[in-house]
C-alpha cells in the first residue's frame, strides 16, 4: 500500500489542485480547451467508507480544487453515456440496479471496491486506487511537491 501511494504521489505531484465538476461532459469540454489532469472518485450510497472518504476530501483546503479537474459520481446511479479520453462508456442496467461501464472497465473488467479512484494525466494515462485514502494520504498525493 505504501509503495502504491508513493508511486501515486510521484505521478500526481503536479496535481496540487483540482477543479470540481458535475458531469463528464463538462470534464471533456474543459479538458479539451485547457488540458489538465483529471481525478475521478467513484462512490456509492451504501458504502460507509465512501462517506468517510468524502469527509476527508471536505477537509482539504478550497484551493485544492484549482488546477486538476475533479468529478465524483455514483456508478450505480449515473445513467448518462460518458466519453472519457475518447472512449465511450454506457450504463448497464440489470433491472432494479446496474453499473456504469466506466467503473467496471477502469477497474480491469470487474466491479471495483469503493471508493474507487482514477487519476489521469493530460494524455489519458491512468492509475487507479481502490479503497480509502486517509486525510494524510490525500495531502501527500495532492501536496507532495510543495513539501
List PLM regions with ranges.
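Structural recognition of the beta-strand scaffold that forms the well-ordered cores
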Residues: 38-41, 70-73, 116-119
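Thiol-based oxidoreductase modules, predominantly thioredoxin-like and allied folds used
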Residues: 20-21, 65-97
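Short active-site neighborhood of thiol/selenol oxidoreductases, capturing the structured segment around
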Residues: 33-47
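Non-catalytic, surface beta->alpha helical segment in thiol-disulfide oxidoreductase systems
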Residues: 93-147
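C-type cytochrome heme c attachment motif
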Residues: 45-52, 116
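Boundary at the C-terminal end of the N-terminal hydrophobic targeting segment
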Residues: 16-18
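Typically the conserved alpha-helix immediately C-terminal to a functionally engaged Cys/Sec
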Residues: 51-65
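Sec-dependent N-terminal signal peptides
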Residues: 4-14
Amino acid at each position: 500500500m505504501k509503495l502504491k501511494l508513493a508511486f501515486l504521489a510521484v505521478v500526481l505531484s503536479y496535481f496540487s489542485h483540482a477543479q470540481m465538476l458535475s458531469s463528464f461532459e463538462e470534464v471533456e469540454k474543459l479538458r479539451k480547451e485547457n488540458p489538465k489532469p483529471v481525478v475521478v472518485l467513484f462512490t456509492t450510497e451504501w458504502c460507509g467508507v465512501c462517506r468517510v472518504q468524502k469527509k476527508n476530501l471536505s477537509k482539504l483546503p478550497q484551493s485544492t480544487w484549482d488546477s486538476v479537474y475533479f468529478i465524483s459520481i455514483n456508478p450505480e446511479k449515473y445513467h448518462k453515456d460518458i466519453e472519457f479520453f475518447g472512449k465511450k462508456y454506457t450504463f448497464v442496467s440489470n433491472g432494479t440496479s446496474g453499473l456504469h461501464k466506466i467503473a467496471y472497465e477502469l477497474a480491469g473488467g470487474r466491479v471495483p471496491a469503493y471508493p474507487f479512484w482514477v487519476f489521469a494525466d493530460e494524455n489519458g494515462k491512468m492509475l487507479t486506487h481502490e479503497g480509502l485514502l486517509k486525510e494524510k494520504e490525500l495531502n501527500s498525493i495532492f501536496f507532495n511537491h510543495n513539501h
